[in-house]
């Protein structure tokens, strides 16, 4: 349950999100807010919770199966036909009524420990379903992180495009003045205007990409609102540092016993083992105790022997107790084949658990290497951005002084713009990979 506790603890740090009965009314959403809302509204999680409740009911019922079963029955019948008459001592055609009242119960004394094994099996099935809830929450959480970071990335990409266009528009005004005094040619002005047109197109695309990113996030959250939906951009990225990353084995050893998919597979294996015990118990003798207490009445006895209904019911009371022993001898090898299949189920569940552990180790190993690679790429892009910025500033100074033409200036500006976009993309790529690794490490999912 550690993963669920980790996710829930995030929400306690973010404060209350519900302000009115209509739902979420805050202007900007943090990552924790988005995760909380998505977990609450996700249909797959709700369905998994239903399955868990059903498994819980099965577990409770299996414990009740050890108790005796008691039932009562009453019947009243009408009959028409040949019946022996005690009045004339011969068979005659007549109509009459009769009935009976019984109370019966039975108790399983010994069933080869099937009841005990069934209780444990249903308990493991219940725990497997609860682990399934955590699995579903893990998937939703990671998807929200992905889409949330995609929105943040597109926000910065749009800001970059806006800044690029703003610089170009300022350059247009400056070039106009240079053209008027004869320091620049009209061709230079047309080139810069063409550059502005291209940057307007890029800005339009950036805005559309941001709208789609918001739409993807909102749909994943199942957030149906006509109000403005905006997320909160972090003030800084404190996790964007070369933190000491634990070894793969260390992260794996800390996660293997707490990760939802491992817990799910482990409980499925234990359930299969108990199911084998249940099937094997069918080879053992079964002993049950039964009892029946009842009475009956007959209209013929009332008419022919002057026995009233209440007197018949009182005099006809009887008690029957039985002890039943069932010993399996030969049943066409049905139990033998059931045991064989149950053993194969146990073996398959063990392989599945081992497969889940291998996949977890591989995922952690891959995530760790991707974090290191993404961090190195991000640092390289920062260095490239710094160099491109210096080159652009130098080119801009030379262009303003008339020492370089518009083509060289435009190349320097495009290189600088590209470097800024690459730096933003690599930053969010690194941050996403770091969030995945931190989740394996048991850290809070926050930005």
Annotated model-derived regions:
Residues 1-37, 207-250, 438-447:
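Terminal intrinsically disordered/low-complexity segments used for targeting and assembly
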Residues 24-147, 287, 291, 333-336:
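Short flexible linkers and secondary-structure junctions
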Residues 57, 139-254, 370, 374, ...:
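Periplasmic alpha-helical coiled-coil/stalk elements that build and connect Gram-negative outer-membrane
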Residues 73-107, 234-243, 277, 290-327, ...:
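Small/polar, glycine/serine/threonine/aspartate-rich low-complexity segments that form flexible
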Residues 24-71, 81, 231-275, 372, ...:
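Bacterial Sec-pathway N-terminal export signals of envelope proteins
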Residues 50, 201-223, 385-443:
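Short segments within alpha-helical structural elements
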Residues 46-50, 63, 95, 109-137, ...:
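Sec/SRP-type N-terminal targeting helices
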């Amino acid at each position: 349950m550690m993963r669920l506790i980790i996710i829930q603890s995030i929400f306690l740090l973010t404060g209350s999100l519900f302000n009115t009965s209509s739902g979420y009314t805050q202007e900007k959403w943090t990552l924790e807010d988005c995760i909380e809302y998505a977990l609450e509204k996700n249909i797959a999680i709700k369905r998994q919770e239903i399955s868990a409740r059903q498994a819980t009911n099965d577990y409770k019922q299996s414990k009740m199966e050890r108790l005796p079963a008691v039932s009562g029955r009453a019947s009243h019948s009408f009959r028409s036909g040949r019946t022996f008459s005690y009045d004339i001592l011969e068979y005659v055609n007549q109509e009459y009524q009769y009935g009976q009242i019984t109370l019966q119960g039975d108790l399983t004394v010994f069933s080869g420990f099937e009841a005990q094994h069934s209780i444990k099996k249903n308990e493991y099935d219940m725990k497997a379903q609860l682990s399934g809830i955590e699995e579903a929450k893990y998937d939703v959480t990671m998807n929200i992180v992905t889409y949330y970071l995609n929105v943040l990335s597109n926000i910065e990409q749009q800001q970059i495009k806006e800044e690029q266009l703003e610089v170009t528009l300022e350059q247009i005004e400056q070039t106009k003045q240079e053209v008027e005094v004869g320091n620049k040619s009209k061709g230079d002005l047309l080139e810069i205007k063409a550059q502005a047109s291209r940057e307007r197109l890029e800005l339009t695309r950036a805005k559309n990409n941001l709208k789609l990113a918001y739409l993807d996030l909102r749909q994943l959250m199942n957030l149906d609102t006509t109000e403005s939906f905006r997320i909160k951009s972090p003030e800084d990225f404190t996790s964007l540092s070369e933190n000491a990353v634990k070894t793969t084995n260390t992260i794996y050893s800390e996660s293997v016993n707490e990760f939802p998919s491992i817990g799910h597979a482990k409980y499925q294996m234990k359930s299969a083992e108990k199911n084998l015990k249940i099937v094997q118990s069918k080879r053992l003798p079964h002993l049950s105790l039964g009892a029946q207490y009842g009475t009956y009445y007959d209209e013929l006895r009332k008419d022919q022997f002057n026995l009233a209904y209440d007197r018949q019911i009182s005099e006809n009371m009887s008690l029957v107790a039985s002890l039943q022993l069932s010993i399996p001898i030969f049943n066409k090898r049905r139990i033998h084949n059931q045991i064989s299949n149950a053993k194969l189920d146990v073996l398959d569940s063990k392989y599945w658990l081992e497969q889940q552990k291998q996949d977890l180790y591989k995922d952690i190993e891959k995530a760790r290497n991707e974090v290191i690679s993404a961090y190195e790429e991000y640092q390289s892009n920062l260095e490239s951005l710094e160099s491109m910025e210096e080159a652009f500033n130098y080119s801009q100074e030379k262009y303003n002084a008339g020492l370089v033409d518009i083509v060289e200036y435009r190349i320097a500006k495009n290189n600088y713009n590209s470097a800024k976009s690459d730096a933003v993309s690599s930053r969010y790529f690194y941050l996403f990979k770091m969030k995945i690794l931190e989740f394996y490490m048991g850290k809070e999912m926050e930005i």
